[in-house]
Amino acid sequence: MVTNITLILTLMTLASVTAQTFQYSRGWTNGKRDGHKRDELRDEVLERILTPCQLDKLKYVLEGKPLNDRLFVPCDYIEEEVNQPKRYKGERNHELFDVFQ
């Protein structure tokens, strides 16, 4: 009987020591993994490596959306299109102007 109790206490002690060692060796604190700083650092590194246009393209592909021509166009061309001012195109509105003149 005494050996059974001793064996149970020894196993419980060994299990609690092993669990505590695992908890502190893996960087766990209060049940949460200490990875928040690493996530922020990873995001900063990605922002330095990839432009917003490239991130949008990567997100588009990872979401499983169908490939289109816009994915294969270099980001420089897309950014130039966005930065250019919108031009007035009067060809479509000739009939409207004729009515008011």
From Swiss-Prot:
Asparagine amide: modified positions: N30
Protein name as catalogued: Pro-corazonin
UniProt entry tagged with the keyword Transmembrane helix: no
Record keywords, A-Z: Amidation, Cleavage on pair of basic residues, Neuropeptide, Pyrrolidone carboxylic acid, Secreted, Signal
Gene Ontology terms: biological process: neuropeptide signaling pathway; positive regulation of heart contraction
Residue numbers bearing the Pyrrolidone carboxylic acid modification: Q20
Gene Ontology terms, MF aspect: corazonin receptor binding; neuropeptide hormone activity
Domain of life, source organism: Eukaryota
Protein purpose: Cardioactive peptide. Corazonin is probably involved in the physiological regulation of the heart beat.
Family: Belongs to the corazonin family.
Listed GO CC annotations: extracellular region
Signal peptide limits: 1-19
Keyword Lipid metabolism set for record: no
Pfam families, alphabetized: Corazonin
